[in-house]
Every structure is written in structure tokens, then in C-alpha cells.
């Protein structure tokens, strides 16, 4: 670049910084830009690996969606618990009015320190979220759920009134405001969403999420969570087998998937994941129903192997460390088949 151009550029950059503040424009090679992405664990070892960066990225919008009772709230409460372990402040905007403090406590959430809001309208919920983000003092904000963000006009109107597209416009406007503040304050914002069926779809995926398309575009990560089976102890159902697909990922390659168990009253089974992922990497040997580690049997059947690791946390930590060291190998094997709607 010649001297005249360099001087003109320097003058323009100086004027921009003077008018809009320091850091409003910078070169990609500057030190501040190259900082490592900060993440918080999801509470699932396999999902952290599938996300490619070790967890959910801060300063971004995350959407978690799936059918009813698929584990959406469990996953977000696990992320809240992980953030609190790091000393972070968490807020839960409960538009569904369905948060169970006792269940949250069982998942490791520090309930007395959790900020909770049960807003009357969608506008109020999103305004509260924006104010919390702008404060810069909250590390994670969860909105549960987008489907329950009812616009004020709909609440104040008659039961049969038509309010076509009102919620979608509300979400679009709110996300335009939120995005910049979320990035500036490095806050992690998670929206839980529900699934609806598109009417008249003959080909392709008839499923869609509520609240219009804005959230799909503004989200850096979109997770599709599904219950794939039941875990039984005799005739009693004690948990559910769960699969999570990374449908969208702006911080790492997408279309990975993770599978884990959600145990009722316990949450995501960390020890179950250690056994499964360890077996996949041949760190844990499986012969018939027996599991072995370093040539020593640790249990017959998965539940007994989990009990062994529960009683021997040092061995569990050792296997987990080896799994993390081989996370690239695991990530390559986690690629999910793309659906027609992805």
C-alpha cells in the first residue's frame, strides 16, 4: 500500500475509533482478535468433543431443540451447573413456569445462587434477558422456552384473535438487539425451543422449530436432542438413552453427534460416557458382558462397571484424561448423517 493510501487509512481508523470508541475497528492480526474461544462444558463429555471446541462457546447464542421429554432442560441445567463450578453467575428465564428447583439441585445446580425470572409476556422475557446481558455481570442466560414467549398483544387479545407472525417478529427484533451485547459482554445465551409439524409437507422433513427463522440464523450452535430408548432396571425405567446432533456450528465443523444416558434424578451419566467412549477408543476392553481396564476386570455389565468407577474416582479421572487426549480421533467418528432439513 502506498504512503497516501496508508495515511488515508490511518486517518479513517483514527476517526472511527474517536467517534465509536477504541476497539470498534481493528485488524484481524491484532492480538485481541486472536484470543482463544472461551467455552463452558455441557456436562456431557461426548457432546463437548462433538462440539469441536470442548463445550458451548461464550459470547454466542445457542439453540437447543427437540420433542417433549427429550432432555432439553436437563442439558441446559447441566451447562448452568458447569458454569457455576467455574464461579460464574447464571440466570434462568422460565417462560414455561416449569423449572423444578429440586431436580435442578440434583443435577448440581447451586439453586440458592441461581437467578430466576418468570415473565408475564414474551417482550418482558426478552427485555429481562437483554438487561442481564448488558449488565456484563451474568455469565449464562437460559430462556425456556421460545414457544412460551407469548407476545403482549396475544395475551391481551381475545382467544380467537389472529396474530400471524407476531412471535417471529418479536424474536427477530430481540435477537438484533441481543447479538451485539452478547458478543461484547461474552455472555452465553441458550434458547430452548420446541418442535412443531409443518402442514402439508409431502417430501423432506416436516418438523420445524417455533419462533420463526431468526433464531436459526443468529445461533452459532444448534443442537437437536432426541430420546432414543429407555434404560431399565428390571421392569423399572431408570433413565433414557439420548442422542444429540450438532445441526449447526459456527466455531467448529458441524454434523457431529453424541450419545449418552440421562439417569432420572441424576442427570447426564458421566461415568456411563467414560465407559462407552473408553470402549470406543479401546482404552476399556469389553469381552462379552465384562469390562476391563489395564487388564483388570472392573465389572460385569455397564451398571457394575459404573459402580466400580464411582468407587474409584482416580481411575475414572485417568480414563477421562486419556479420552480427552484422543478427542480428535473420537470427533472423526462422530459424524452424523445429514437430514434434508439441515
UniProtKB/Swiss-Prot annotation:
Molecular function GO labels: ATP binding; ATP hydrolysis activity; ATP-dependent DNA damage sensor activity; damaged DNA binding; single-stranded DNA binding
Predominant place of localization: cytoplasm
Amino acids binding ATP: 66-73
Keyword Calcium recorded: no
SMART domains recorded: AAA
GO annotation (BP), single: SOS response
Domain of life per record: Bacteria
Keywords (A to Z) from UniProt: ATP-binding, Cytoplasm, DNA damage, DNA recombination, DNA repair, DNA-binding, Nucleotide-binding, SOS response
GO cellular component, one term: cytosol
Cellular localization per UniProt: Cytoplasm
Known role: Can catalyze the hydrolysis of ATP in the presence of single-stranded DNA, the ATP-dependent uptake of single-stranded DNA by duplex DNA, and the ATP-dependent hybridization of homologous single-stranded DNAs. It interacts with LexA causing its activation and leading to its autocatalytic cleavage.
PANTHER family assigned to the protein according to its UniProt record, in alphabetical order: MITOCHONDRIAL DNA REPAIR PROTEIN RECA HOMOLOG-RELATED, RECA
Family: Belongs to the RecA family.
The name this protein goes by in its record: Protein RecA
Organism: Methylophilus methylotrophus (Bacterium W3A1)
Amino acid at each position: 500500500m502506498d504512503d497516501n493510501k496508508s495515511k488515508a487509512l490511518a486517518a479513517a481508523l483514527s476517526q472511527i475509533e474517536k467517534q465509536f470508541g477504541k476497539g470498534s475497528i481493528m485488524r484481524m492480526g491484532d492480538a485481541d482478535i486472536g484470543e482463544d474461544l472461551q467455552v463452558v462444558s455441557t456436562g456431557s463429555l461426548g457432546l463437548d468433543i462433538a462440539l469441536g471446541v470442548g463445550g458451548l462457546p461464550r459470547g454466542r447464542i445457542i439453540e437447543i431443540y427437540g420433542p417433549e421429554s427429550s432432555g432439553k432442560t436437563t442439558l441446559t441445567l447441566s451447562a448452568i451447573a458447569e458454569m457455576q463450578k467455574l464461579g460464574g453467575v447464571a440466570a434462568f428465564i422460565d417462560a414455561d413456569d416449569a423449572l423444578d428447583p429440586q431436580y435442578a439441585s440434583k443435577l448440581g445446580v447451586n439453586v440458592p445462587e441461581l437467578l430466576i425470572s418468570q415473565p408475564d409476556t414474551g417482550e418482558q422475557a426478552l427485555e429481562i434477558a437483554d438487561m442481564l446481558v448488558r449488565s456484563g455481570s451474568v455469565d449464562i442466560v437460559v430462556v425456556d422456552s421460545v414457544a412460551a414467549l407469548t407476545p403482549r398483544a396475544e395475551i391481551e387479545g381475545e382467544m380467537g384473535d389472529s396474530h400471524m407472525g407476531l412471535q417471529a417478529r418479536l424474536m427477530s427484533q430481540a435477537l438484533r438487539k441481543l447479538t451485539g451485547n452478547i458478543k461484547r459482554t461474552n455472555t452465553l445465551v441458550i434458547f430452548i425451543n420446541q418442535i412443531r409439524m409443518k402442514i402439508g409437507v409431502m417430501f423432506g422433513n416436516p418438523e420445524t422449530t417455533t419462533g420463526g427463522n431468526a433464531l436459526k440464523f443468529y445461533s452459532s450452535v444448534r443442537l437437536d436432542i432426541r430420546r432414543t430408548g429407555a434404560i431399565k432396571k428390571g421392569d423399572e425405567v431408570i433413565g433414557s438413552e439420548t442422542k444429540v446432533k450438532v445441526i449447526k456450528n459456527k466455531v467448529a465443523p458441524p454434523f457431529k453427534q453424541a450419545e449418552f444416558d440421562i439417569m432420572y434424578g441424576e442427570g447426564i451419566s458421566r461415568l456411563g460416557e467414560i465407559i462407552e467412549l473408553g470402549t470406543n477408543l479401546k482404552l476399556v476392553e469389553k469381552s462379552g458382558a465384562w469390562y476391563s481396564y489395564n487388564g483388570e476386570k472392573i465389572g460385569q455389565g455397564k451398571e457394575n462397571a459404573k459402580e466400580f468407577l464411582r468407587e474409584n474416582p482416580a481411575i475414572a479421572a485417568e480414563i477421562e484424561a486419556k479420552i480427552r487426549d484422543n478427542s480428535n480421533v473420537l470427533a472423526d467418528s462422530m459424524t452424523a448423517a445429514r437430514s434434508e432439513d439441515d
